[in-house]
């Protein structure tokens, strides 16, 4: 097994490489994708009309599509899966597309909220499991959700979105299916990847609800004063198999994670591991990639607060964010202190009911969220 570590430096160097290095641009375009990859990616021209995401069906006036679309796209690209059977599959059993989003058990309220809000799918709570599933498998529900997130995808899961949309479109256009459940409905007009600024919509809120966290480290220094260190972290992992006859390595999470690092003006850390499989598998090996953004600088944490105040988290991480923000603001106003009511004491007290140790949950933040029209 071979591990390699990289640090992608912030603002200046990333832009310079992107604009001035043809070799770098090429490398960026051939990085591996998550499950299924980008394959032979089809490109679609933007019609610059993200507002009209539901076509030829009842428009739900309760939904704020401009905010719901990016949030759900981020959530699905983080902890969701769009399952579409390959058209070339030789399996006798055929199945239509389905969308699955996984929530930890504590976030059952959020799963139910999104299910009821979109009127798509069902929520399943597994007995003796620490997670719940939001499952959308009916054609109308899949059609609706694909329309909502259309134009807001930012990661390699866009490829699965495209295959799902194409399946739906082929189904709509089919003249051989007698019982077409999507008659008199327009095709999904597939839009390209969203390359807008990270701070322009709620995509990062959805992704953070899935894969981000707000941490508090307590450093008990000997030669220097003890400190409470708050930081925001987002890490995305991917893997794929490659053999001597397969050189189709495509897009990865590198681009989107670089954009997030650039937005907060921090470094992007990456790690890779090569795992050789059986020789009989034609020199096949599996590649693992990990990309991590960490925001620990006090002033940059303020920008984190500004973003998530504008586009609130909706999971129980919202409660962790509120506590985390208290510590960041206290340190910003008064500095580090081990005195009574100082940052050290606050950090200790917050961690008693925080992240994995949290036992107190409230859901008032799910009332009249920004995903709904007021």
Model regions and ranges:
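Internal intein/HINT superfamily modules and their associated LAGLIDADG
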Residues: 1-374
């Amino acid at each position: 097994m071979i591990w390699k570590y990289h640090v992608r430096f912030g603002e200046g160097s990333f832009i310079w490489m992107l604009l001035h290095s043809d070799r770098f641009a090429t490398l960026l375009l051939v990085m591996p994708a998550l499950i299924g990859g980008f394959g032979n990616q089809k490109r679609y021209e933007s019609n610059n009309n993200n507002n009209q995401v539901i076509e030829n069906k009842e428009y739900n006036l309760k939904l704020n599509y401009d905010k719901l679309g990016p949030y759900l796209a981020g959530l699905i690209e983080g902890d969701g899966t769009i399952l579409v059977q390959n058209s070339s599959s030789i399996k006798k059993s055929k199945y239509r597309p389905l969308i699955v989003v996984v929530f930890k058990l504590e976030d059952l309220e959020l799963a139910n909220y999104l299910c009821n809000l979109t009127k798509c799918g069902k929520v399943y709570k597994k007995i003796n499991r620490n997670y719940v599933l939001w499952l959308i498998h009916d054609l109308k529900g899949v059609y609706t959700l694909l329309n909502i997130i259309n134009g807001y995808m930012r990661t390699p899961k866009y490829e699965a979105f495209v295959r799902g949309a194409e399946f739906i479109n082929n189904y709509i256009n089919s003249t051989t299916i007698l019982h077409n459940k999507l008659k008199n409905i327009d095709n999904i007009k597939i839009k390209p990847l969203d390359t807008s600024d990270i701070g322009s919509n709620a995509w990062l809120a959805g992704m953070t609800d899935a894969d981000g966290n707000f941490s508090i480290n307590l450093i008990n220094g000997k030669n220097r004063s003890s400190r409470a260190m708050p930081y925001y972290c987002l890490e995305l992992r991917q893997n794929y198999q490659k053999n001597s006859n397969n050189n189709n390595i495509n897009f990865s999470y590198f681009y989107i994670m670089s954009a997030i690092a650039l937005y907060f003006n921090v470094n992007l850390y990456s790690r890779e591991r090569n795992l050789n499989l059986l020789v009989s598998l034609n020199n096949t090996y599996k590649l693992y990639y990990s990309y991590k953004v960490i925001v620990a600088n006090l002033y940059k944490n303020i920008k984190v607060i500004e973003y998530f105040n504008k586009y609130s988290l909706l999971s129980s991480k919202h409660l962790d964010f509120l506590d985390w923000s208290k510590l960041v603001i206290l340190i910003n106003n008064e500095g580090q202190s081990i005195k009574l009511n100082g940052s050290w004491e606050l950090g200790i007290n917050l961690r008693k009911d925080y992240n994995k140790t949290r036992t107190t949950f409230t859901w008032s933040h799910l009332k009249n969220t920004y995903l709904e029209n007021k």
